[in-house]
């Protein structure tokens, strides 16, 4: 039996799908949502891979751009239907989900624009010179890609999400392993994607969808698959990475795993806007029931009882909301019991309980910096949910926040890190300068005077970070640069003009 595979995100069961039907649930009630869907048998996975392999040739960039636009247009036209369906399976709210469909279609159109711009090819032409051949380099697609959908974003990181959009843009056929947390949403989204692609004249087999644990294992092991994209838990990601590495022909694995996204609040910021910071923190921490990979799970604040009181007051005003799955909820409850048992840790504040069997109570715990460092490995574990740990420090002791980073207490890899400072305060500016070199080593995005939860889909975005945040810190899963994961450079040396790819023929 294969190693435990994946969960495409926290909440995906490592055992559901062993040739058993995939059943979604309503997180508000814990009852089944829709009929179970059959897991894909081996023959179905093999057919999907064979079709994807056959489709991998000659899909022009202009046609890919038109196809991505067509998918975006059709998903937009079905926004209300999709949001209602996803709300039944995720309880994330139709308003949030409507916005997420728009984010997803915006992503698709962004990559259509990337294709029309052409810069993703990274073409370089060096004409022959004295004792030097004619060399022409261009990026080419790697081949069919397997995408493991995530639980917490049923559109933007799922069937038609960023991994799928960027791979299709690169010219790579995609087979999505659906997340069992929203099976009917996945199925309907896939139907619309296939309809739009067919209408745009895309090659048959360029997109596929499979359900089930065993299907995911077989997909990763399939000889025709050239790369894997994943968003989810560290445990699930490492299991998949192992499968990729153990193939006779190892393939790249791009995994976004766990992150606690440390926030550093400097003294001047507390003096300038303490209540505002407390409210912003509570809002970011509990957004979406804390089920964001960019959730600010670890916050370092000056030793200041008044500010701790403002944080406690802000958190006390929050209300719990259903989590995506029973397993996520029970995992959070168990993790918090472990957290509360660590020496020096105390409960600072709790919000109001949410409604439903999977709705946790938002909570914030506190610990002094010296106790945190004594148990850092345990205390920087990710707790996926509306829960945070406040670490109080003395700015003039042990190097302050920068000392915590330099000693490795904050951890080695995060998607984000945040500095809250008073921009006109010289002491804060000096402390921030001391922090920056360390944060540049451990985080892919550094936020100033904001909160890390939102991740803009832009050309400049980098959503990645050193392990264990991701398995490939040089790459991003959000933004235009995400296409680079699915490309490989090829150099043509002294090639006859008639054999060169069109962009190199000039």
Label the predicted regions.
Residues 53-56, 60, 72-79, 83-86, ...:
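Structural signal for hydrophobic packing residues in well-ordered secondary-structure cores
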Residues 5, 279, 301-415:
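NAD(P)-dependent aldehyde/semialdehyde dehydrogenase
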Residues 355-360, 410-500:
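C-terminal core of ALDH-fold dehydrogenases
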Residues 1-133:
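N-terminal Rossmann-like NAD(P)+-binding subdomain of aldehyde/semialdehyde dehydrogenases
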Residues 120-277, 282-283, 300:
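Rossmann-like NAD(P) dinucleotide-binding subdomain of oxidoreductase/dehydrogenase enzymes
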Residues 63, 67, 172-185, 206, ...:
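Short loop-to-beta-strand entry elements in the cores of soluble alpha/beta enzymes
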Residues 152, 181, 214-215, 225, ...:
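Short, glycine-/Ser/Thr-/acidic-enriched flexible segments
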């Amino acid at each position: 039996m294969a190693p435990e595979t994946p969960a495409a995100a926290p909440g995906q069961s490592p055992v559901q799908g062993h040739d058993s039907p995939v059943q979604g649930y309503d997180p508000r009630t814990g009852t089944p949502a829709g009929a179970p869907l059959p897991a894909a048998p081996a023959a179905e996975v093999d057919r999907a891979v064979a079709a994807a392999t056959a489709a991998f040739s000659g899909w022009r960039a202009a046609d890919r751009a038109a196809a991505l636009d067509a998918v975006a247009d059709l998903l937009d036209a079905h926004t209300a239907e999709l949001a209602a369906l996803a709300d039944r399976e995720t309880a994330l709210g139709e308003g949030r989900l409507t916005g997420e469909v728009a984010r997803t279609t915006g992503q698709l159109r962004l990559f259509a624009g990337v294709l029309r711009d052409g810069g993703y090819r990274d073409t370089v032409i060096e004409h022959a010179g004295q004792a030097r051949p004619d060399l022409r380099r261009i990026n080419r697609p790697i081949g069919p890609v397997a995408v493991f959908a995530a639980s917490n974003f049923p559109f933007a990181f799922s069937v038609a999400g960023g991994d799928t959009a960027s791979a299709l843009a690169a010219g790579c056929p995609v087979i999505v392993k659906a997340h069992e947390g929203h099976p009917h949403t996945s199925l309907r989204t896939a139907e619309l994607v296939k309809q739009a692609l067919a209408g745009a004249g895309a090659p048959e087999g360029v997109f596929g969808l499979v359900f089930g644990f065993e299907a995911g294992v077989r997909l990763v092991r399939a000889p025709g698959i050239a790369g894997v994209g994943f968003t989810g838990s560290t445990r699930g990601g490492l299991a998949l990475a192992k499968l990729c590495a153990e193939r006779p022909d190892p393939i790249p694995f791009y995994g976004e795993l766990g992150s606690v996204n440390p926030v550093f609040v400097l003294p001047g910021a507390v003096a300038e806007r303490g209540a505002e910071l407390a409210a912003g923190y509570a809002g970011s921490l509990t957004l979406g029931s804390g089920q964001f990979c960019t959730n600010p799970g670890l916050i370092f604040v000056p030793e200041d009882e008044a500010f701790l009181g403002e944080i406690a007051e802000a958190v006390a005003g929050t209300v719990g909301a259903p989590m995506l799955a029973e397993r996520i909820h029970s995992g959070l409850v168990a993790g918090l019991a472990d957290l509360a048992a660590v020496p020096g840790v105390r409960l600072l504040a709790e919000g109001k309980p949410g409604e439903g069997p999977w709705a946790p109570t938002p909570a914030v715990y506190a610990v002094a910096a010296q106790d945190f460092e004594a148990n850092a490995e345990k205390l920087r574990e990710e707790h996926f949910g509306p829960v945070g740990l406040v670490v109080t420090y003395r700015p003039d002791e042990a190097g302050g926040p920068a000392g915590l980073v330099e000693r490795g207490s904050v951890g080695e890899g995060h998607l984000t890190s945040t500095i809250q400072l008073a921009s006109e305060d010289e002491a804060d500016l000096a402390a921030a300068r001391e922090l920056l070199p360390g944060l540049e080593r451990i985080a892919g995005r550094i936020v100033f005077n904001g909160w890390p939860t939102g991740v803009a889909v832009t050309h400049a975005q980098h959503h990645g970070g050193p392990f264990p945040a991701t398995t490939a810190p040089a790459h991003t899963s959000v933004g235009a640069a995400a296409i680079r994961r699915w490309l490989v450079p090829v150099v043509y040396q002294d090639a006859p003009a008639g054999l060169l790819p069109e962009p190199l023929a000039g």
